Amino acid sequence: MIDYNIFATGSKGNAVVIDQKILIDCGVSFKALSKVYRALKLVLLTHIHSDHFQPTTLRLLAENRPTLRFACCAWLCKPLVDAGVPVSQIDVLEPGHMYGYGICNVRPDMVKHNVPNCAWKVWLPSGKLFYCTDMNNLNGITAPNYDLYMVEANYDDAEIQAKIAEKKLNGEYIYELGVLHNHMSLAKINDWLYANMGQNSAYIYMHCHQDKEDAT
């Protein structure tokens, strides 16, 4: 069984620790990770939005853990360096390729968002993990019979259409129109899960929609 600790998920921050050793996303303060950072071996990053990428936290992780590896795709290499993470601690990975870290194997896959973003497939001694948030769809991506899926289920179609109609009527700014283009609905992710899950698979809905104009 894969051990996980969700420190935050949603527009206010995202950070998940897997098997006490792997941090996926880093959208929280260093203080929030104070009890776990010493055991971390690997950080997997997805995209630049501040609820997933906190430069100060990343710099402090690198300073306090000089052997910690930071894995990302090319679009996050410069932001990591600008944050203060030494180049020697950064691994730039190519989407669609598997990489070995001893404690696990990982593979990033590009997904559609309003900035470059990736999902992570992680092969652990405890099982296979698929992690993805902030995506419009998972077209072309499969992860059959994984043990755990941690995936975005951002909104219910009927509820968000009702919010859009209400805001149109009131002449308000309709943030939800952007949500439709940049995030995954409950219905779409359920269809994808049903097509990929095995009999013993488990799933967790992540990054559920909050009715705030500053969500990302």
Regions flagged by a language model, labelled:
Residues 1, 7, 58, 106, ...:
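Extended recognition/assembly regions associated with phosphoester-bond processing machinery
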Residues 1-36, 118-134, 148:
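Conserved beta-strand hairpin/beta-sheet module of binuclear metal-dependent hydrolase folds
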Residues 8-9, 26-28, 48, 75-76, ...:
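Active-site metal-binding loops of divalent metal-dependent hydrolases
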Residues 15-16, 97-152, 156:
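Catalytic core of the metallo-beta-lactamase
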Residues 75-82, 211-215:
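Short, charged/polar "capping" segments at the starts of alpha-helices
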Residues 29-75:
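Active-site metal-binding motif and surrounding structural segment of the metallo-beta-lactamase
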Residues 1, 42, 56, 63, ...:
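Catalytic phosphate/metal-binding cores of nucleic-acid and nucleotide-processing enzymes, i.e., regions
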Residues 143-216:
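Cap/insert and terminal regions of metallo-dependent hydrolase folds
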